[in-house]
């Protein structure tokens, strides 16, 4: 009986010792690779500045000039092609003034050395045809490194409350 008591005591002592020890995390020899998302952020900032300045040329310079580029628009429609989107921007910017655009929750995710995406919330206020408008929503932009420049290759915007009174451009209408 005495041997069982001693054995139980030893087991109990080892149990307390094992659970009571504090362990230090193992040191790693290599740090995780740092990602440089600043060039992507810079391209995004140029886009935002172009919108605030109501400058279609500046805005479109951030997008890849391709007839295959796809935009999911704020009004629930889709536009295909850089030229078409440029014409749409020029047409709508002719009626816009005093634009303010606030970006919150900006997140840049690098998908490798030549691809990234940005997600954010946006709130825009502007005069459109002389009337004050406010809109807000979420946006995802996919970027690709083309040559030395980061270009948007896809845009998806989702408004919080779409304005049913805003016109849908001919190029934005669904095709049969």
What are these regions (language model features)?
Residues 1-4, 21:
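Positively charged n-region of N-terminal signal peptides that target proteins for export
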Residues 7-15:
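Bacterial N-terminal signal peptides
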Residues 21-62, 170-176:
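Short, low-complexity N-terminal intrinsically disordered segments enriched in polar/charged residues
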Residues 56-111, 133:
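A solvent-exposed, acidic/Ser-Thr-rich amphipathic alpha-helical stretch
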Residues 89-90, 103-109, 122-124, 138-144:
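Hydrophobic/aromatic beta-strand elements that line small-molecule binding cavities or substrate pockets
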Residues 114-124:
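A short hydrophobic beta-strand element
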Residues 128-130:
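Outer-membrane beta-barrel domain signature
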Residues 136-164:
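Short beta-strand edge/turn micro-motifs at domain boundaries
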């Amino acid at each position: 009986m005495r041997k069982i008591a001693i054995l139980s005591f030893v087991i109990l002592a080892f149990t307390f010792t094992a659970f009571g020890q504090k362990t230090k995390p193992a040191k790693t020899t290599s740090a995780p690779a740092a990602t440089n998302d600043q060039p992507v952020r810079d391209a995004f900032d140029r886009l935002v500045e172009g919108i605030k300045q109501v400058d279609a040329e500046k805005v479109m310079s951030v997008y890849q000039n391709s007839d295959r580029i796809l935009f999911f628009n704020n009004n629930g429609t889709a536009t295909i092609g850089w030229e078409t989107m440029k014409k749409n921007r020029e047409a709508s910017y002719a009626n816009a003034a005093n634009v303010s655009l606030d970006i919150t929750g900006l997140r840049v995710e690098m998908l490798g050395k030549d691809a990234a995406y940005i997600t954010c919330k946006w709130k825009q206020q502007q005069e459109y045809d002389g009337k004050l408008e406010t809109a807000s929503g979420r946006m995802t932009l996919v970027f690709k490194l083309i040559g030395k420049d980061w270009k948007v290759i896809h845009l998806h915007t989702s408004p919080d409350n779409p304005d049913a009174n805003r016109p849908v451009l001919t190029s934005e209408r669904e095709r049969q």
